[in-house]
Regions:
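Core alpha/beta nucleotide-donor-binding catalytic domains of modification enzymes
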Residues: 1-163
Length: 163
């Protein structure tokens, strides 16, 4: 048993337990080029045959860092190696009042781009990669902000078409 197959098996169990995907579904993988989303893409690639998934890839290019172009090229090359269709969605992040801050405005632009991309490829689900560290960070951030019990749940397995 390899680490990759063990991870794919655990992910498959989670997908089934939480009803995240149905067999034959069309999925858009949101891939930034970071470790979380690359792992997501690798696992979706490993599971697509057994679940009959049609997987497409999108990279949202915020243009905020000098490495943004290299990240996009990396995601396109990785997708090509895996035999998956991919494209880049360039977004303009709002930087004028009323303004909620760079992180919030980037998230808003990214989510809108992901919804557009999903419609364009006919995806019923948008997969994003999150780790246990992301979960812990989300819960801690919400505690600091004075969350109620619902905020202690962290990142949900499913929210609308996002998984």
């Amino acid at each position: 048993v390899t680490i990759a197959s063990s991870l794919a098996g655990r992910v498959l169990d989670t997908i089934r337990r939480h009803g995240m995907l149905r067999d034959g579904e069309r999925v858009l993988a949101a891939v930034s080029g970071g470790a979380d989303s690359v792992a997501l893409l690798d696992v979706l690639g490993a599971l697509r045959a057994s679940l009959g998934l049609a997987v497409s890839v999108v990279h949202v290019h915020h243009g905020l860092r000098p490495e943004s172009d290299a990240d996009a090229e990396f995601v396109l090359a990785l997708s090509a190696r895996l035999g998956l269709p991919a494209h880049v969605e360039r977004v303009a992040v709002k930087r004028a009042p009323p303004w909620d801050g760079l992180e919030a405005e980037s998230r808003r632009a990214r989510h809108a781009a992901l919804q557009r991309a999903a419609r364009a490829v006919g995806a019923t689900r948008i997969a994003t990669g999150h780790t246990a560290d992301d979960q812990a960070e989300t819960v801690l951030f919400r505690i600091v902000r004075g969350t109620g019990l619902a905020g202690l749940a962290g990142i949900p397995y499913r929210r609308d078409r996002f998984i």
